[in-house]
């Protein structure tokens, strides 16, 4: 029997990484919010790898934090190992990655949700989106649970992860299920289809979890964390804690032989899996087939937490049967006597075609319905959380009658992510990578606060105290850059001895300290030896000063490119344009433009199938329209 159980401004369906950020953002912006989870013990669950961050993903976490989100703070509280990846490369691709204690992460995030003002946390399966339809225009009015409870709401955010019609595949066995042995959400997909929303079918997978006591670590390479810990959250200046090690081992020809001989029994190759899997996180059988010339593949053995013997085998995701999993794992050095605690499996699930969304993450054809995370065809906790905070902010802004927050490609990786999926769509689980960002030298993880904290403050998620500290940091950076550029270094014996020691050419006449800093073999901290008036500054400030001066030429060039990009982004396109009526546009361009309804000429130019010639026609049309109006 149906009954009215409550009324809210925002209802968030799902409490994974997208749902948590969405619910917290909306509630913190002062709107009455409820978040639903199929099981409250699965809030902020990590059904796959027990880590936060990584290449490009670390950028997303720092951007979420700079806007006022929770993921970075929670990772800082619960990590057990921290590392900067790509440190041998340039600063554009430095990426922070932390191994976290999976259960501690969940407990901390659950507690954060439970204590949040304006937020109720409820265990229930949502089976239907309730909506009104007037003259073909749909508007959400709430959600219904499996027990018939109706919750009225002005906005609904779907953050359903991999639960929609979830199907687990292990070899030739398949059954209806969600991740980690939880129930799937089988009815909500039908509700979305009835609303006319286009769904797709994707697949992802996870490796086995094995017992630490059955591993011989002496046959593996130890992978310790970094000595100096860089926090995810800009609110944390320094963290000191004991870290645990991960371990590296490799597959071999025997492992690959067993996999090849059993390919017909894999869900992926045996035909049981219909969904499209992630290109950049392939299963081990996929890797063995696609990279047949490779003699070995890396396997990282990672702890799931401090109070468990479970270890995660990164690189060994598979849908092979249980008996084959045991056989192949026992060919790997250090895993000869391994005991599997949880089998590897593949999971298939429904998601929406994200080209149905506006850049605000609201569906174009359903007023008040937002989506975030894996339901939008993305993969990864960080990608989900990034969409979650934007959906939560924009849900609250919609209720307050404010314009949505839209970050563009020159402002944030979050902007690149959302623009990519909304404008281009995706035919496989989308993963964030540094190569997707055209302006990656400007979108570094170290300057996420300089880029986005003023926006977070303006939106209302950054406190006065935090913003005051941020402005002080910005002042110190600007002041020190100016000092370094003005400081003269004379060609003294001490200076030239220092330069020789660091394999740098001695100077014959006075130079600015900034000129020495631009030399590739010298860095800001090293130069302290000959920089007598240097102030005592935090690592975060020193890093900004160093990068800003060392890469100044490249940064200026990229800023000029951004100016060109902005010109097309500022040419807005009305929603009511009928592209069929614009003479000169090719048929494919008309069809794509009418379907996606881009918000600017810049966005239109990135749609697959819209050529530079089509953009020229569009610009001429806009000029004609402008003249007619004036």
Swiss-Prot record:
Coiled coil: none annotated. GO terms for cellular component: cytosol. The keyword Chaperone does not apply. NAD-binding protein involved in the addition of a carboxymethylaminomethyl (cmnm) group at the wobble position (U34) of certain tRNAs, forming tRNA-cmnm(5)s(2)U34. PANTHER family: GLUCOSE INHIBITED DIVISION PROTEIN A, PROTEIN MTO1 HOMOLOG, MITOCHONDRIAL. Homodimer. Heterotetramer of two MnmE and two MnmG subunits. This is tRNA uridine 5-carboxymethylaminomethyl modification enzyme MnmG. The lineage of its organism: Bacteria, Bacillati, Bacillota, Clostridia, Eubacteriales. The gene is mnmG.
């Amino acid at each position: 029997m149906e009954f009215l159980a409550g009324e809210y401004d925002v209802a968030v369906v799902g409490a994974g990484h997208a749902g948590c950020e969405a619910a917290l953002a909306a509630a913190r912006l002062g709107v009455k919010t409820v978040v639903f989870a199929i099981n409250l013990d699965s809030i902020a669950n990590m059904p796959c790898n027990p880590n936060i961050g990584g290449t490009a993903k670390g950028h997303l976490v720092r951007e979420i934090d700079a806007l006022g989100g929770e993921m970075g703070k929670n990772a800082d509280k619960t990590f057990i190992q921290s590392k900067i990846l790509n440190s041998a490369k340039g600063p554009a691709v430095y990426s922070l990655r932390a191994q976290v204690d999976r259960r501690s992460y969940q407990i901390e995030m659950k507690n954060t949700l439970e204590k949040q003002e304006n937020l109720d946390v409820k265990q229930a399966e949502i089976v239907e989106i309730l909506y009104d339809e007037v003259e073909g225009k749909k508007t959400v009015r709430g959600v219904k649970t499996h027990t018939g409870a109706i919750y009225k709401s002005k906005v609904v955010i779907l953050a359903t992860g991999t639960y929609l019609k979830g199907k687990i595949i292990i070899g030739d066995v398949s059954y209806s299920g969600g991740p980690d042995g939880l129930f799937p959400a089988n009815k909500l997909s039908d509700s979305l289809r009835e609303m006319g929303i286009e769904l797709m079918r994707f697949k992802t997978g996870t490796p086995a979890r094995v017992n630490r006591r059955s591993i011989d670590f002496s046959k593996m390479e130890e992978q310790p964390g970094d000595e100096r810990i860089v926090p995810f959250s800009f609110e944390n200046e320094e963290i000191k804690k004991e870290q645990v090690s991960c371990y590296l081992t490799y597959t071999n020809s025997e492992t690959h032989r067993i996999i090849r001989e059993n390919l017909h029994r894999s869900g992926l190759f045996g035909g049981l899996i219909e969904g499209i899997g992630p290109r950049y996180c392939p299963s081990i059988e996929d890797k063995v087939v696609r990279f047949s010339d490779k003699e070995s593949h890396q396997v990282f053995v990672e702890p799931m937490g401090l109070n468990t013997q479970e270890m995660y085998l990164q690189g060994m995701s598979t849908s092979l049967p249980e008996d084959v999993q045991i056989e192949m794992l026992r060919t790997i050095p250090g895993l000869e006597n391994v005991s599997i605690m949880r089998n590897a499996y593949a999971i298939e699930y429904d998601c929406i075609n994200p080209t149905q969304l506006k850049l605000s993450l609201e569906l174009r054809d359903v007023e008040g319905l937002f989506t975030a995370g894996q339901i939008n065809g993305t993969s990864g906790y960080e990608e989900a959380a990034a969409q979650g905070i934007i959906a939560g902010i924009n849900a609250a802004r919609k209720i307050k009658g404010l314009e949505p927050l839209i970050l563009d490609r020159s402002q944030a990786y979050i902007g690149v992510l959302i623009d990519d999926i909304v404008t281009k769509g995706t035919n496989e689980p989308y993963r964030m990578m540094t190569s997707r960002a055209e302006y990656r030298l400007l979108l570094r993880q170290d300057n996420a606060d300089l880029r986005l904290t003023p926006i977070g403050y303006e939106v209302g998620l950054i406190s006065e105290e935090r913003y005051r500290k941020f402005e002080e940091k910005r002042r110190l950076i600007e002041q020190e850059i100016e000092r370094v550029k003005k400081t003269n270094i004379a060609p003294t014996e001490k200076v030239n001895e220092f330069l020789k020691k660091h394999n740098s050419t001695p100077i014959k006449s006075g130079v600015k300290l900034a000129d020495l800093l631009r030399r590739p073999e010298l860095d800001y901290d090293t130069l302290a030896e000959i920089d007598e008036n240097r102030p005592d500054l935090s690592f975060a400030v020193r890093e900004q000063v160093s990068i800003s001066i060392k890469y100044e030429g490249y940064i200026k060039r990229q800023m000029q490119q951004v100016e060109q990009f902005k010109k097309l982004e500022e040419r807005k396109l009305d929603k009511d344009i009928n592209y069929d009526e614009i003479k000169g546009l090719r048929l494919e361009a008309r069809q794509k433009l009418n379907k996606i309804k881009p918000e600017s000429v810049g966005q239109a130019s990135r749609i697959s199938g819209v050529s530079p010639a089509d953009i020229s026609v569009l610009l001429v049309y806009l000029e004609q329209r402008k003249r007619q109006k004036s």
